[in-house]
Amino acid sequence: EDGLTHKLRNICQEYPDQQIMEYIAVYSLEELFHAKLLPIQYGSIPGRGQLAGKRKIERILRRKFTGRLDVVKCDIHKAYPSVTVECVMNLLKRDIGKNKVLIWYLGALMENYPGEHLCIGGYLPSWLFNYVMSYVLRYLLSLSQSRRGVQTKMVKAIVCYADDFTVYGYFSQLTKALKKATRWSKSTLGLDVKPAWQ
């Protein structure tokens, strides 16, 4: 049981040899993670973390935007269990498909995951979750609407910590953007985005 939220979590305790293999995998994927993870992601990434995320939120609220701004706090429902090995492998094949040996190695490592989804508590799964999450965030940031021939971004800013993220913008645009992102992430990645209007 989680001490803060009192949620029951299925934590995975990996064997030492699995942990070593996962460290090798993360090292091998460094270039991919450097290219794909966004600067707005703060969870389980060295040099970032909660304090850096908090400072980013403060900068957004104090300096970046003048006038009124609406904020939606969102999270991914059952985040790690929602990310299947199949989903991760499809994205990896798309991005590093030419590296057959690395694809084989990652597939073999993830065969050990119970339930065929990412495990809470593993080193590689935390990086892979951020990798999958970057697709959701990138999709949200790409949304725009055209009015009188002028394109405007529907989402002004995002700050993400693991599966929790805050989205900044104007209420009407955020409503549309989150509906689109919820549909897209469910159909494409199998993730269920839960917005909580505050």
What is each model feature region?
Residues C12-Q13, I24-Y27, E86-C87, K180-T182:
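Surface-exposed beta-strand edges and their flanking turn/coil or helix-capping segments
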Residues E1-I20, K36-G49, L109-Y131:
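Short, conserved non-catalytic motifs in the polymerase core
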Residues E1-D2, Y27, V167:
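Hydrophobic side chains in beta-strands
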Residues R59-A196:
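Conserved polymerase palm-domain catalytic core
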Residues D2-G3, P16, L32, H77-A79, ...:
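Generic structural motif
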Residues E22, V26-T84:
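Active-site-proximal segment of RNA-dependent polymerases
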